[in-house]
């Protein structure tokens, strides 16, 4: 099928197919087990005695014609749309809360504000940094949900938020802390020769007294 023609294996009905399931037009197109785009349409052209297929085996749901839409073409729209769904995000750097009450049910978001100072040489350049949470006295999976990734600050933006979810519990315990490390800046730098920035957040216990 198409994957065999271009030398790319993925997930799908056959060993060289990019679709999750047969006839999955509009679904995810996968390469190396990762979503690489959207399968806009697929088809198997045939007529009379001609059934064009790369190997003549029934190992795919499509033949040699396919069209994929790259997800990355809409990455800015995806990122910015998701950010609008953040619950109660801070409207300014001064409004960022450095402490968060853990509560007893569900999760509560806490935010980190990443600010771009100065100016872009090219206004169309995307600035990015990598980020990763790190345990302090708070433990990932127990007190907060670990997160890592790449944060992009798009043209006409001067900041972006990283959201981390705090896990509720009803255990009396001391206040706890965890960290967010920001590193590997692209199209910008931290200044003064710095290679990493770190911020801390405190999870405030609301479950009674703790003696330790």
Question: Where in the sequence are the language-model features?
Answer:
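Short boundary segments that mark the start of a structured unit
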Residues: 87-212
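C-terminal subregion of chymotrypsin/trypsin-like serine protease catalytic domains
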Residues: 2-14, 18-90
């Amino acid at each position: 099928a198409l994957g065999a023609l271009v030398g790319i294996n993925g997930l799908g009905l056959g060993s060289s197919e990019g679709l999750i399931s047969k006839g999955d037009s509009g679904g995810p197109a996968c390469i190396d087990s990762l979503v690489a785009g959207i399968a806009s349409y697929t088809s198997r052209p045939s007529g009379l005695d001609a059934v064009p297929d790369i190997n003549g085996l029934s190992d795919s749901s499509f033949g040699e014609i396919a069209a994929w839409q790259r997800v990355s073409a809409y990455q800015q729209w995806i990122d910015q749309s998701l950010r609008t769904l953040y619950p109660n995000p801070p409207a300014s750097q001064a409004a960022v809360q450095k402490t968060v009450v853990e509560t007893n049910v569900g999760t509560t978001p806490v935010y980190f504000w990443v600010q771009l100072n100065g100016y872009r040489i090219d206004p169309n350049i995307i600035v990015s940094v990598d980020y990763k949470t790190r345990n302090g006295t708070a433990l990932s999976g127990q007190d907060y949900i670990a997160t890592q990734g790449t944060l992009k600050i798009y043209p006409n933006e001067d900041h972006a938020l990283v959201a981390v979810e705090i896990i509720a519990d009803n255990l009396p315990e001391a206040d706890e802390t965890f960290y967010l490390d920001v590193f590997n800046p692209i199209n910008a730098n931290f200044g003064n020769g710095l290679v990493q920035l770190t911020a801390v957040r405190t999870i405030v216990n609301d479950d009674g007294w703790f003696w330790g």
